[in-house]
């Protein structure tokens, strides 16, 4: 990373202030070229910026000089706190582009440099990406916990414990080499396992499993997925509109009005939801397009965190958490359900307040607690592999095979925080960031 990058890291102009970040070995020279001198490190300094090509006055503003490695990226950095007009920012960016060795940053490149220089690890970078995309308070607090290293600190402790277990085992193996214990002597080799070896492995695996048993990050990021299902004209779309507080779905007395999935994200009391309205389920009378919609409705139900079933009692999709809903409490002629969780009317509002409260409480119980770190799919997979390796090591009688399982465990922990990884995976992650971050 020998080149120097720059980008607007604040919001798009016009704005009160526009902040341009510069990072790389040429950051100091770039700042000097525009400001005429290099200010004192880490002190906000008022400076007049001029275009190095012709001396044109660009702006009078605050600048910061941040020499590395104790910076966000681990490199020399500079910040220009400009007046946030489009023309001002465009002129300063053009001046920076004219300097040799400087180029515009790609999405996420500042954070990628921070990762490459050891300022953050992969788990913290993933938390930062989630923090930037957070839209609800619950998402923000969970992402912040990850970005501030909640998982990374645990991984460091687990790795230290695992290294201690491994060191005791390796010492026993070294001792066996000196005493020339035969490879085929199973009893003697089993006796080489350190005292409490299996118990130590299981204890560490249990610590990992407490994290594996936590609610996952995906439902929080994507929204707790609630699918409304039932036959045509059961009141699904009316209830859907009431939940999202928007006339998102067309409602009519004609059966089959909804023919495809209609998805809408909404936050209820700070809890993220994804509500899905579906085509009415029926076996007869549906045209070709409606049949496609019905197939999609059944597929959506299989992916739901919760199904709101508005059809005949007991006939809802099996295999997922399901609430029986009688959605026409305002209609005296509508049938009631004996085991119904809720009788309500989205038209009159009857029962809706209690229903919303129950829905929010149910989602909260399935999502990470406020401020609690949560594993994503990648992290969960690696941590599961580590726990399995520890359990295999505990069950192993051959110390050589036990040592190999411990090595696999260490490798999994390293992958968890990005000490090992592939460029493709890193490209995907940092591509989620905006330019200037």
From Swiss-Prot:
E.C. no: 3.6.-.-
Cofactor annotation: K(+)
GO biological process: tRNA methylation; tRNA wobble uridine modification
Binding residues annotated for (6S)-5-formyl-5,6,7,8-tetrahydrofolate, in chain numbering: 21, 79, 119, 437
One annotated Gene Ontology cellular component of this protein: cytoplasm
SUPFAM superfamilies named among the record's database cross-references: Folate-binding domain, P-loop containing nucleoside triphosphate hydrolases, TrmE connector domain
A Pfam family: MnmE_helical
Major localization listed first in the record, in broad terms: cytoplasm
Alphabetized GO MF terms: GTP binding; GTPase activity; metal ion binding
Database matches in CDD domains: trmE, TrmE_N
Binding site for GTP: 233-238, 252-258, 277-280
Compartment annotation: Cytoplasm
InterPro entries attached to this UniProt entry: G_TrmE, GTP-bd, GTP-bd_TrmE_N, GTPase_MnmE, MnmE_dom2, MnmE_helical, P-loop_NTPase, Small_GTP-bd
Keywords from the UniProt entry: Cytoplasm, GTP-binding, Hydrolase, Magnesium, Metal-binding, Nucleotide-binding, Potassium, tRNA processing
Domain TrmE-type G: 223-364
EC top class named in words: hydrolase
Keyword Magnesium carried by entry: yes
The protein's assembly and partners: Homodimer. Heterotetramer of two MnmE and two MnmG subunits.
Functional description taken from the UniProt entry: Exhibits a very high intrinsic GTPase hydrolysis rate. Involved in the addition of a carboxymethylaminomethyl (cmnm) group at the wobble position (U34) of certain tRNAs, forming tRNA-cmnm(5)s(2)U34.
NCBIfam families: PRK05291.1-3, small_GTP
Name of this chain's protein: tRNA modification GTPase MnmE
Species: Novosphingobium aromaticivorans (strain ATCC 700278 / DSM 12444 / CCUG 56034 / CIP 105152 / NBRC 16084 / F199)
Protein encoded by which gene: mnmE
């Amino acid at each position: 990373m020998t080149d120097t990058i720059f980008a607007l890291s604040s919001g798009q102009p016009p704005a009160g202030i526009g902040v341009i970040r510069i990072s790389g070995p040429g950051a100091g020279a770039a700042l000097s070229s525009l400001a005429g001198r290099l200010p004192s490190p880490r002190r906000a300094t008022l400076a007049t910026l001029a275009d190095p090509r012709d001396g044109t006055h660009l702006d009078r503003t605050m600048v910061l000089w941040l020499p590395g490695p104790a910076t966000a990226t681990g490199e020399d950095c500079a910040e220009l706190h400009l007046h946030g007009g489009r023309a001002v920012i465009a002129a300063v960016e053009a001046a920076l582009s004219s300097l040799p060795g400087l180029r515009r940053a790609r999405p996420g490149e500042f954070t990628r440099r921070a990762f490459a220089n050891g300022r953050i690890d992969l788990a913290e970078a993933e938390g930062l990406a989630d923090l930037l995309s957070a839209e609800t308070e619950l998402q923000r607090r969970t992402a912040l916990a990850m970005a501030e290293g909640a998982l990374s600190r645990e991984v460091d402790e687990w790795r230290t414990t695992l290294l201690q277990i491994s060191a005791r085992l390796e010492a026993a193996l070294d001792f066996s080499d000196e005493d020339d214990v035969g490879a085929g002597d199973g009893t003697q080799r089993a006796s080489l396992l350190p005292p409490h070896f299996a118990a130590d492995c299981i204890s560490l695996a249990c610590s990992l499993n407490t994290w594996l048993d936590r609610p996952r990050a995906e439902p929080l990021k994507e929204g707790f997925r609630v699918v409304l299902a039932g036959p045509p004209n059961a009141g699904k779309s009316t209830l859907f509109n009431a939940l999202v507080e928007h006339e998102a779905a067309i409602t009519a007395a004609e059966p089959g009005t909804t023919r495809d999935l209609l998805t809408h994200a909404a936050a209820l009391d700070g809890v993220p939801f994804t509500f899905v309205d579906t085509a009415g389920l029926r076996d007869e009378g549906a045209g070709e397009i409606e049949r496609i919609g019905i197939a999609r409705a059944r597929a959506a139900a299989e992916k739901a965190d919760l199904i709101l079933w508005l059809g005949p009692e007991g006939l809802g999709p099996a295999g997922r958490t399901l609430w029986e809903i009688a959605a026409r409490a305002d209609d005296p002629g509508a049938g009631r359900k004996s085991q119904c969780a809720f009788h309500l009317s989205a038209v009159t509002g009857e029962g809706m307040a209690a229903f919303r409260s129950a829905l929010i409480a149910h989602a909260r119980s399935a999502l990470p607690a406020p401020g609690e770190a949560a594993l994503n799919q990648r992290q969960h997979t690696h941590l599961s592999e580590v726990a399995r390796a520890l359990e295999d090591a505990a069950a192993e009688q051959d110390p050589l095979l036990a040592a190999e399982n411990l090595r696999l465990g260490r490798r999994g922990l390293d992958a968890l925080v990005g000490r090992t990884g592939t460029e493709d995976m890193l490209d995907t992650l940092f591509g989620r960031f905006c330019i200037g971050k």
